[in-house]
């Protein structure tokens, strides 16, 4: 039996934890399995192969994964021929991979982030020889092109422009599990986007741990803004998004590029992490509070309707009440459209995990609750400010909240629910906003847009 016949008559199911990069990797795994003859299962119980794509950014995510792996023991007892594979950032940490291999003997395959291309061969080994395998590569120098994708979404797609990160923020595990920055060749990116356009997709989101530093590791002279300009020329693609931006490498040229484009969406995900210069320095972020505020002011001066979202960590080692108040003050002054807020979580192997002055859990809990309360009020007001305006929406599908409604996003990445015909899915329509809430908007189709 050849490699590309192994999956004939078999089904797979993937559980994905973590960020958009992991979602992209799961699409790659699905593409490989599709080529091998596997079909997607409707549930874990139906699967012959179960893959867990893991996240290592916070301890809570790791504990959740370990708990899930434990429960799969009973599933495999009832279906002994099922194969279980664990991949992603969590098992790129060798001590974690070894623990899972040792403690969870029902797991058949363990593979890391740097050898996802080898998954078909690892699966073949297990299926034909019946032996478990653990393979974690430490070679973070390669970029694998032409890997297959199996995308579920026919409207929008993730497109990776770079892998890894060179920043080594003191709290962050990502450079250790994703490796050094490797920018993809712009021609390969362009080819992928052109292919997506031919398939009828309308929107792409460019992914990188730090999109602003794209190209700095390439021999050719190309910047992120150069890449955006080239991709904007591709016919069929209506919207281009990107994430994540790093304040240290952000420049005004990006703002100008957005202002001059009718395709690149006016949304900046710009993680600030803290509002205290003392904490920013301890984090190794490479910028000050003042520099960050200057970026925000530059964006709003040129693109007043742009949305700005962020990430914030509370309870970082050494964070005193005064530091936290500076973060609250920044939030209240910048008025982010939304914020992903996190309690600091120790990551083994990072400098921050060894720092003195670790903040106690009760203090962290009080601070995160206060921050969420402040930001939620701001988010609600930012969305209420859009009431009675008409927004251009890319209709993504039936609303998850109400199957009688459609949902889609504004150019500024606001989720909007509204009544409409399912034939509009995949189309751009104008919607008049009637209600704004903290996390979403409601509206009705602006009839003039359908005539």
Curated annotation (Swiss-Prot):
Record has Iron-sulfur as a keyword: yes
Catalyzed reaction equations: N(6)-dimethylallyladenosine(37) in tRNA + (sulfur carrier)-SH + AH2 + 2 S-adenosyl-L-methionine = 2-methylsulfanyl-N(6)-dimethylallyladenosine(37) in tRNA + (sulfur carrier)-H + 5'-deoxyadenosine + L-methionine + A + S-adenosyl-L-homocysteine + 2 H(+)
Domain MTTase N-terminal: 10-128
UniProt binding sites for [4Fe-4S] cluster 1: 19, 55, 89
Residue stretches making up the Radical SAM core domain: 151-381
Any coiled-coil regions, as ranges: none
Keyword Chaperone (UniProt): no
Group of enzyme by EC: transferase
Stretches assigned to the TRAM domain: 384-447
Self-association state and partner proteins as the record states: Monomer.
Compartment(s): Cytoplasm
Protein name: tRNA-2-methylthio-N(6)-dimethylallyladenosine synthase
Pfam annotation, one family: Radical_SAM
Entry function: Catalyzes the methylthiolation of N6-(dimethylallyl)adenosine (i(6)A), leading to the formation of 2-methylthio-N6-(dimethylallyl)adenosine (ms(2)i(6)A) at position 37 in tRNAs that read codons beginning with uridine.
Residues that hold [4Fe-4S] cluster 2 according to the record: 165, 169, 172
Cofactor(s) demanded: [4Fe-4S] cluster
């Amino acid at each position: 039996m050849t490699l590309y016949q192994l999956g004939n008559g078999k089904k797979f199911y993937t559980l994905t934890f973590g960020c958009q990069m992991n979602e992209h990797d799961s699409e790659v795994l699905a593409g490989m399995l599709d080529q091998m003859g596997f079909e997607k299962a409707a549930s874990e119980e139906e699967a012959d192969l179960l893959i867990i794509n893991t996240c290592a950014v916070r301890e809570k995510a790791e504990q959740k994964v370990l708990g899930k792996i434990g429960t799969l023991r009973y599933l495999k007892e009832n279906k002994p021929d099922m194969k279980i594979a664990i991949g992603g950032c969590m098992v790129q940490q060798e001590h974690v991979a070894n623990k899972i291999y040792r403690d969870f003997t029902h797991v058949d395959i363990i593979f890391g982030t740097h050898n996802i291309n080898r998954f078909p061969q690892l699966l073949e080994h297990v299926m034909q020889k019946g032996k478990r395998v653990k393979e974690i590569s430490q070679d973070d120098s390669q970029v694998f092109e032409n890997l297959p994708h199996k995308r579920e979404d026919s409207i929008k797609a993730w497109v990776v422009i770079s892998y890894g990160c060179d920043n080594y923020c003191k709290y962050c595990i990502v450079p250790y599990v994703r490796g050094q920055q490797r920018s993809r060749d712009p021609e390969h990116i362009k080819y992928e986007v052109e292919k997506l356009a031919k398939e009828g997709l309308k929107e792409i989101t460019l992914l990188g741990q730090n999109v602003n530093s794209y190209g700095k590791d390439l021999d050719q002279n190309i910047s992120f803004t150069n890449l955006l300009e080239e991709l904007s020329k591709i016919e069929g693609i209506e919207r281009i998004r990107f994430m994540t931006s790093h304040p240290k490498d952000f420049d005004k040229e990006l703002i100008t590029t957005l202002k001059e484009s009718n395709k690149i969406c006016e949304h900046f995900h710009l993680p600030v992490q803290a509002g205290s210069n003392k904490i920013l320095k301890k984090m190794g972020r490479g910028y000050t509070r003042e520099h960050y505020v200057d970026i925000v002011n530059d964006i709003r001066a040129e693109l007043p309707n742009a949305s700005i979202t962020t990430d914030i960590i509370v309870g970082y080692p050494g964070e005193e009440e005064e530091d936290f108040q500076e973060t609250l003050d920044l939030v209240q002054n910048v008025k982010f459209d939304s914020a992903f807020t996190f309690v600091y979580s120790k990551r083994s192997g990072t400098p921050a995990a060894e720092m003195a002055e670790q903040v106690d859990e009760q203090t962290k809990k009080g601070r995160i609750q206060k921050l969420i309360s402040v930001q939620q009020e701001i988010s609600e007001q930012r969305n209420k400010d859009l009431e009675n305006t008409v927004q251009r929406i890319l209709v993504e599908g039936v609303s998850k909240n109400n199957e009688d409604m459609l949902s889609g996003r504004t150019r500024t990445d606001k989720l909007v629910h509204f009544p409409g015909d399912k034939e509009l899915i995949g189309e751009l329509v104008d919607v008049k906003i009637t209600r704004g809430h903290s996390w979403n908007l409601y509206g009705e189709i602006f009839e003039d847009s359908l005539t």
